[in-house]
Amino acid sequence: MLDVLADSGPLGALFNRRDKFHTLAIEFFRAHGASLRCHTTWAVITEIMYFLDFSAAAQGDFLEWLYEGHTRGLMRIATIEPSDLPGLAAMVRKYADRPMDLADASLVWLANKTDITNIISVDRADFAIYRTSKRKSFRNLFPV
């Protein structure tokens, strides 16, 4: 089982047929889904729910899929504590020229916490720039 950080793009694309990455996301998870353990955050989940706001059915399907993945041990959801906020604020300031949103900051925070640097994201440019606190780069496994 390969541990990966999961960003909103590939996960949200699974549930939006109009998303330009929908077919790629379907193919990626068909080929690799059973061998991946995805780690994400509530900030990423919130972003996905916003992206799927065009359809309560799509939002419900996503939440059920998330729950199923969690119960099967294929999806882990990390919770940011109030004590983590100063570190997130420092990251947002550090990458102000990008700019870094909370979902991205939460994934870098999670990488720092877990030492996982494999990621699936459609945001290749930003995750090519971001570094962990140990100065490790991210390896994007999503083929965009």
Task: Identify what each model region corresponds to.
Residues 49, 53-71:
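Glycine/small-residue-rich phosphate/adenosyl-binding loop
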Residues 1, 108, 112-144:
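Acidic, PIN/NYN-like endoribonuclease modules and their adjacent C-terminal/linker elements
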Residues 13-14, 51, 130:
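Residues that scaffold the ATP/ADP-binding catalytic core of kinase and kinase-like folds
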Residues 10-11, 47-48, 87:
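A general alpha-helix detector
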Residues 76-118, 122:
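Active-site neighborhoods of divalent-metal-dependent phosphate/nucleic-acid chemistry enzymes
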Residues 1-20:
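Metal-dependent nucleic-acid phosphoesterase active-site entry motif
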Residues 9-10, 43, 83, 125:
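Alpha-helix/helix-capping structural signal
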Residues 4-6, 24-55, 76-79:
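PIN/NYN-family metal-dependent endoribonuclease catalytic core
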